Amino acid sequence: MPELRTDRLVLRRWRESDLEPWAAMNADPEVREHLGELLTREQSDAAVALMQAEFDERGFGWWALEARETGEFIGRAGLDDVDEDMPFAGADAGVDIGWRLTRTAWGHGYATEAAMACLAYGFDVLGLPEVVATTTVNNLRSQAVMRRIGMTRDPADDFEDPSVPEGPLRRCVLYRSPRREHRRKSS
C-alpha cells in the first residue's frame, strides 16, 4: 500500500492505534447520518481487516487519514470497486471514491484534499478511465466535496440504492469524473 502525502494529510496503511478512533467514528450518529446503522467495535475492526486485505489484493482501496501536523487519525479516504448490484455498474463504471472523517475534522477541507490525492492516484497511477462517487440525496456536504474535486452530476443518473432498505437513505446521487476531465483540469 503506497503512502500518499498532501500538504496537510498522510494517506497511509491502517495501524492498530487507528482501531479505537475508527470505532468511535462508526458509533457516532452524526458521522453515520447518511450511512445507516451504527457499527459495533467488532464490526469496525472487521471492516479495517477487510479494507487492508482488499487494498493489498487490488492495489487500491481505503487509506487511513492522518493529520500531518498532529499525527492524529481523522478518518479514511480511498477508492473502491463499484458494487455489481448498482444500477450504473458495468465495464465502464470505474471505481467509487469516498471519504469519512471524524466530526472534529469536518469543515477544514480535509475531505477535498484527500479526495484530490485519491483521484490523482486513480487516474495517474492506476490509469482508471473514470471515477464515480455516490451519496444520499440529502448529504449536501459530500456533494459539495464532489463538486470541488471537479466531479459532475446528471440528475438522470440518480438512483435507488438496492442495498439500502426503503427510507430516506435509499435515494442517491451519482457524480462522475472521467479521466479526460481530470487531465484537462490538472493541466
Residue ranges and their predicted role:
Residues M1-E20, A24-H34, A49, E66-S187:
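Acyl-donor (CoA/ACP) binding surface of acyl/acetyltransferases
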Residues E30-M51, F60-W63:
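Conserved GNAT-fold acetyl-CoA-binding loop/helix
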